[in-house]
Each structure stands twice: as C-alpha cells, then as structure tokens.
C-alpha cells in the first residue's frame, strides 16, 4: 500500500509466508506438532510528513516474526533417512505396536523419528524503528539544515525443545555378501 499527497506520504508492505512439509501431521500425540513448518510475517511502514514548509518528519517501522517447528531429529536428517533407507528394510511397526528396526539401519525408523522423538519450536521476533526530524535553516544561510534522529531496535528469540524416546525391535534383517537385503 502506498499513497498520500503533498504533506503526507506513506508506504506499507505486509508479507506472509507459510511452508508446511509434505509429511503427514502427527495425530497420535497432540501435545506438540512435529511436522516441519516455517511461518514468517514481515511488516514495513514508512511515513513522510511535511510538518511545515521547512520541517520534515520521517518515521520507519519494520517488524518480523518467524516460527520454525519440526522434529527434534532435524529437518534435513529426517529426509536423508527417508530417502536413504529402503522401504522394505524393516516394518514401520510390528503387530505389538513397537517400531521396526534392523541390525543394518539400527533404530533409524523415519516414522518414529518424525513423530515420537520429540519436537522443536523456535520463535524469533524483531522490531526496528527510526524517527528523524529535519529543519531547513535557509533563513540563516541558504542550504543549511539541522537534523535529529533516534532509533530503536529490539530482537529476541524463544527456543522450545521436548525429548521423547521410543521402543524399537530389531527385525533381524542383514545384508548378504552380494549386497542383497535378507
């Protein structure tokens, strides 16, 4: 948004971004969300005001909020395991509800790591503001002016992590001498 006239001008932009992973949401444990998510909101506003013919006021405000959520195991690590472990290496879960694993891949069951290993939630925020007033002093000397400015910056973050463990059972799979999974 932008507009104004001779005495007052403004510009504002708002940007919202949300990226939610293609991975299915954890519905078994609703205490926290382990689905990798990146949410951002950015706002920028500029105001220019001609207070008088020789006095100008400028105000700028920028704010940003960012929230990252996901599995405690890590965003990249979970995808490395999803693509690096064959789908038939072990059962996702055994009939008794215990997660599958193997002597080859250990306890790196991608579903268990995604939904039952814990979560992270990081929230960041920033607020940046500046104000300046400029007074022309042409009545004393042509081209002379005085300007005063002040600014305020505030940046913060909050980090939340939960840990959880899960049971897994070795399915007894191994790799033969010719490289076949047995």
Where are these regions (language model features)?
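Membrane-embedded beta-strand positions in outer-membrane beta-barrel channels/transporters
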Residues: 42-44, 128-134
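Membrane-embedded beta-strand positions of outer-membrane beta-barrel proteins
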Residues: 12, 59, 131, 146-148
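Extracytoplasmic loops and strand-loop junctions of Gram-negative outer membrane beta-barrel proteins
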Residues: 25-31, 109-118, 182
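Carboxylate/His-rich catalytic cores and anion/metal-binding grooves
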Residues: 148, 155-164
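Short, Φ-rich (hydrophobic/aromatic) sequence segments
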Residues: 142-144
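Flexible loop and strand-edge segments within Gram-negative outer membrane beta-barrel domains
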Residues: 1-15, 19-22, 34-108, 118-124, ...
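Flexible, surface-exposed loop regions and adjacent strand-edge segments
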Residues: 27-34, 74-84, 162-173, 180
């Amino acid at each position: 948004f932008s507009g104004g006239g001779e005495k007052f001008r403004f510009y504002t932009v708002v940007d919202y971004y949300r990226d939610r992973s293609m991975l299915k949401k954890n519905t078994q444990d609703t205490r926290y969300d382990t689905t990798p998510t990146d949410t951002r909101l950015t706002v920028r506003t500029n105001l220019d005001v001609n207070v008088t013919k020789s006095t100008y006021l400028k105000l700028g405000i920028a704010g940003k909020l960012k929230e990252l959520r996901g599995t405690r195991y890590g965003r990249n690590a979970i995808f490395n395991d999803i693509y690096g472990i064959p789908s038939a290496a072990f059962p996702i879960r055994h009939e008794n509800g215990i997660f599958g694993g193997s002597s080859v891949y250990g306890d790196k069951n991608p579903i268990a790591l995604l939904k039952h290993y814990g979560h992270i939630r990081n929230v960041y925020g920033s607020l940046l503001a500046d104000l300046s007033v400029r007074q022309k002093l042409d009545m004393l000397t042509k081209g002379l002016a005085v300007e005063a400015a002040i600014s305020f910056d505030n940046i913060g973050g909050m980090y939340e992590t939960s840990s959880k463990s899960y049971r897994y059972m070795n399915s007894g799979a191994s790799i033969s001498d010719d490289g076949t999974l047995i």
